[in-house]
């Protein structure tokens, strides 16, 4: 990894991409510390450690702990993406048609996603402001008028749209997927405070007689992080190599060709999607906290969309598994893959080209996604269950989710840099 970075900084184009990405992240971190006007910052500390705030911060990359202009982060954009991609599955004919139009269709889809992001962000802004205001005994918003709530929602929505645009700029001119990189940066920024929270609760606040137990627990947390990091890295890099043969040429070198399919084809996207799927309804529910908090329907919905309850954690895990299968077929389209192999005169041994190849790849994706989804689900589930059962700090509960995102983004950045370096070497060799 370090040698890759060293070589990357020697190349001017890659170096500029790194600097551009860091510059955008600097702008993001500055915005994450600018509090929305009209908000009582002291009041937000009362709810800063509730289950929703750390979760929303994790999935959005925002700065909800100080109610910044980037409080919602990219969460509304992720929610909009989920909705649009689901509607493209033979539900809305227009969206399905756009999916087949290549770059032109992609631009149209992105435009609709932006419009939907505006709506989701505005609704979430109203919901979360009303909810947090109720939780802080009406102390969050200084001037509690409808106009003030609308103004706050407009500012937070504008922050989301700006952050989404910055993410697109990273994707186009920097390194990695912009949205994932922003979420990654938010998690990294909170990492020191998360570790300090564990250190404070388990060591500093413990009595002298129990302090050794806190020290052992803190060491155990560090060891667990290292072990999970290694496991996630191994699974993220593991792949199934399907042998490929060509009818139109002979392999002079004697080397075999492979079609590599990752064990976790979807990467960290299922975790981000599942988190957003839980957080979005939870933020909207907060708007009804004060008026409907005692109603049965509210209690049921609050159980479902909360990671502090066992049903909520189970649903969250099932969503990760579901999105893993769904996004695997988005990342690798068996029909297009079979078509491209046939055009190149390539085939899988013992498998007929065309429909048989498509079915074979689909079955392989299902098998790989089964392993990948169970692994992702367990990494996200176990720390959260431990937190709920033993009343551990919330940073531990979200540790699995955070690790999955951080490691996934780091590996993706490493792969992209290596790809750019190989491209430079290849171009230099041709010249």
From Swiss-Prot:
UniProt xrefs under Pfam families: SecY
Tagged with keyword Chloroplast: no
InterPro entries xrefs: SecY, SecY/SEC61-alpha, SecY_CS, SecY_dom_sf
Coiled-coil spans in chain: none
GO biological process: intracellular protein transmembrane transport; protein targeting; protein transport by the Sec complex
Positions of transmembrane segments: 18-38, 67-87, 115-135, 150-170, 178-198, 215-235, 268-288, 312-332, 365-385, 392-412
Cell compartments where the protein resides: Cell membrane
GO CC list: plasma membrane
Its membrane topology: Multi-pass membrane protein
Keyword presence, Coiled coil: no
Key words, A-Z: Cell membrane, Membrane, Plasmid, Protein transport, Translocation, Transmembrane, Transmembrane helix, Transport
Oligomer status and interactors: Component of the Sec protein translocase complex. Heterotrimer consisting of SecY, SecE and SecG subunits. The heterotrimers can form oligomers, although 1 heterotrimer is thought to be able to translocate proteins. Interacts with the ribosome. Interacts with SecDF, and other proteins may be involved. Interacts with SecA.
Function (record text): The central subunit of the protein translocation channel SecYEG. Consists of two halves formed by TMs 1-5 and 6-10. These two domains form a lateral gate at the front which open onto the bilayer between TMs 2 and 7, and are clamped together by SecE at the back. The channel is closed by both a pore ring composed of hydrophobic SecY resides and a short helix (helix 2A) on the extracellular side of the membrane which forms a plug. The plug probably moves laterally to allow the channel to open. The ring and the pore may move independently.
Stated family: Belongs to the SecY/SEC61-alpha family.
Protein known as: Protein translocase subunit SecY 1
Record organism: Lactobacillus kefiranofaciens subsp. kefiranofaciens
């Amino acid at each position: 990894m370090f040698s890759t970075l060293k070589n990357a900084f020697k190349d001017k184009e890659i170096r500029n991409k790194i600097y551009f990405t860091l510059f955008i992240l600097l702008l993001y971190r500055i915005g994450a510390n600018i509090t929305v006007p009209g908000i009582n910052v002291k009041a937000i500390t009362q709810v800063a450690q509730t289950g929703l705030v750390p979760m929303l911060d994790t999935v959005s990359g925002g700065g909800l702990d100080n109610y910044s202009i980037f409080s919602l982060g990219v969460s509304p954009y992720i929610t909009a993406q989920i909705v649009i991609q689901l509607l493209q599955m033979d539900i809305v004919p227009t969206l399905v048609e756009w999916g087949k139009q290549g770059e032109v269709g992609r631009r149209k889809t992105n435009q609709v996603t932006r419009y939907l992001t505006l709506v989701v962000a505005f609704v979430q802004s109203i919901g979360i402001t009303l909810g947090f205001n109720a939780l802080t005994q009406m102390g969050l918003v200084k001037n509690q008028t409808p106009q003030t709530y609308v103004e706050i929602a407009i500012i937070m929505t504008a922050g989301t749209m700006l952050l989404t645009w910055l993410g697109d700029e990273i994707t186009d001119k920097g390194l990695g997927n912009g949205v994932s990189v922003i979420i990654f940066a938010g998690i990294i920024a909170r990492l020191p405070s998360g570790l300090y929270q564990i250190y404070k609760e388990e060591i500093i606040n413990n009595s002298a007689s129990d302090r050794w137990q806190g020290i052992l627990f803190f060491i155990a947390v560090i060891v667990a992080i290292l072990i999970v990091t290694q496991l996630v890295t191994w699974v993220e890099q593991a792949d199934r190599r399907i042998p490929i043969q060509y009818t139109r040429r002979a392999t002079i070198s004697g080397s075999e060709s492979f079609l590599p399919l990752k064990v976790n084809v979807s990467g960290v996207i299922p975790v981000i999607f599942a988190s957003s799927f839980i957080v979005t309804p939870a933020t909207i529910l907060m708007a009804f906290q004060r008026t409907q908090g005692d109603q049965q329907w509210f209690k049921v919905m609050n159980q479902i969309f909360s990671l502090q309850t066992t049903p909520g954690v189970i649903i969250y895990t099932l969503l990760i598994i579901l999105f893993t299968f769904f996004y695997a077929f988005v990342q690798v389209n068996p029909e297009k893959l079979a078509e491209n192999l046939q055009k190149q005169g390539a085939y899988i041994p013992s498998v007929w080209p065309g429909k048989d190849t498509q079915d074979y790849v689909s079955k392989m994706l299902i098998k790989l996604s089964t392993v990948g989804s169970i692994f992702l689900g367990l990494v996200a589930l176990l720390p959260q269950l431990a937190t709920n059962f033993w009343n551990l700090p919330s940073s531990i509960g979200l540790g699995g989710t955070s690790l999955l995102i951080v490691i996934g983004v780091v590996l993706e950045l490493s792969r992209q840099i290596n790809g750019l370096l190989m491209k430079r070497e290849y171009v230099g060799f041709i010249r």
